[in-house]
Regions:
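Intrinsically disordered, low-complexity acidic regions enriched in Pro/Ser/Thr
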Residues: 1-152
Length: 152
């Protein structure tokens, strides 16, 4: 498996208010793999809307630390894997509104993202095929994830 490049990109979700409906402005970091937005890859493959954001959203520093720990799989032994929510509802952050997740594995060759899925917390995750797996250099991956909260 070839190494992929993980980067983060600042994104602004504009706010608005019309007809009694308010959309909250959000600034967040989007995951990019080899230059492509992971959200765009997921929504174009899955055929759903793209109104999601990562938990690296401005104004929620406590959430950032939890997300960093989840992405680094700190509690897993090498060879272990964990499913991590990577995109959430931009209004409330509740998985019940729908979310995208990925299985993250710490292997002897690096960090692997695979088995992407859409989930809502009350049904089994719905696998999204034809995406990944992606292999990342473990040191570079760790650096990017640890530095992310400072970029929010």
């Amino acid at each position: 498996m070839q190494l992929s490049a993980l980067t983060l990109d600042r994104v602004n979700r504009p706010g608005s208010s019309s007809g009694g409906c308010t959309v909250t402005e959000r600034n967040y970091l989007d995951f990019r793999i080899d230059g492509c937005s992971v959200l765009n890859i997921l929504t174009s493959t899955d055929g759903t809307h793209s109104d999601f954001m990562t938990p690296f959203v401005s104004g929620f520093p406590q959430q950032h630390q939890t997300f960093v720990a989840d992405l680094l799989c700190r509690d897993l032994p090498e060879g272990g894997a964990a499913r991590v929510i990577i995109y959430i509802c931009p209004e409330c952050g509740d998985i019940g509104c729908g979310a995208y997740s990925v299985e993250i594995e710490r292997s002897d060759i690096g960090i692997v993202w695979g088995s992407f899925a859409y989930e809502n917390g009350y049904e089994s995750p719905l696998p999204i095929s034809d995406i990944g797996p992606f292999l990342f250099d473990p040191d570079e991956y760790k650096r990017i994830i640890i530095e992310a909260p400072a970029l929010c």
